[in-house]
A protein has these predicted regions:
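Active-/binding-site microenvironments in catalytic and ligand-binding cores
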Residues: 1-249
Length: 249
């Protein structure tokens, strides 16, 4: 008797094995940038070989630390029924389309507009569609992510997206919008967040999740297979994730 599922599994493994995997999560380590009102990431060597006979670390962090996903409940008090544990674990297993603006030398407060998204699609020949993930690369992570005394500049300053850009992705019926900044569409200037139409109007109210603080976006192809799972956190406002993208060779 043969296992009827073996063939399908072999096909998936062979397909993924022939693709290039890109790790999209920055390392969780002491000193990484954090939203100012969130606790510092703490990693404590709570159990050691010398003292206890084995090794285990204790970790304390906000749900929105490092690469993470925002659920509607994060920003919307009337959507507390949509915490991260109400979404399927495979919700973020889908194709993703890259919108790469890393060559524009964006400054804090600069906005990506719907016209810029359309122009990029014309240039790349790829358009995000229903059920896919839109990935916007500002070039922010590569330029400003650090873990030293200047780490917080990354979260205190950022470009963002205009309201019509946020509506653009909503109208495409995407599953999620992902970026390499701390707050996706929210531009930040000297620690002051500007408008956040994606969080409050265009995305979260429509169950479009928000993925933030991704790295290595410059390694992506125009379309890739995106895979990430949130932790199964009871009533979670969001969750850290370990996202990867599989790109054609």
């Amino acid at each position: 008797m043969t296992d009827s599922g073996t063939g399908a599994i072999d096909v998936v493994l062979k397909t993924l094995g022939n693709m290039r995997m890109v790790d999209l999560a920055p390392k969780l380590e002491r000193g990484i940038p954090r939203w100012p009102t969130h606790p510092h990431l703490t990693i404590d060597k709570a159990v050691t070989h010398e003292h206890d006979g084995y090794y285990c670390q204790a970790i304390m962090m906000a749900e929105h630390t490092g690469a993470h996903v925002d659920a509607p409940a994060h920003m919307l008090p009337d959507r507390m029924d949509r915490t991260i544990d109400t979404f399927r674990p495979d919700h973020l297993f889908t194709s993703a389309v890259l919108y790469d603006f890393s060559d524009r030398d964006l400054k804090p407060g600069d906005l990506i507009t719907a016209d810029m998204l359309r122009a990029y699609e014309e240039k790349s020949g790829v358009k995000v569609g229903e059920g896919e993930i839109a990935i916007v690369n500002y070039g922010w992570m590569k330029r400003y992510w650090r873990t030293d005394s200047k780490a917080q500049w990354y979260v205190l300053n950022a470009p963002g997206m205009s309201e019509d850009a946020c509506d653009f992705f909503r109208e495409r019926k995407v599953k999620a919008v992902a970026t390499d900044t701390v707050a996706a569409e929210t531009a930040i200037i000297d620690g002051v967040p500007q408008a956040n139409p994606g969080h409050m109007k265009s995305w979260l109210p429509h169950d479009i999740l928000i993925i933030e603080m991704l790295t290595n976006l410059e390694q992506l192809t125009p379309r890739s297979l995106f895979m990430a799972m949130p932790l199964h956190i009871d009533e979670g406002s969001g969750s850290p994730i370990r996202p990867v993208a599989f790109c054609p060779n």
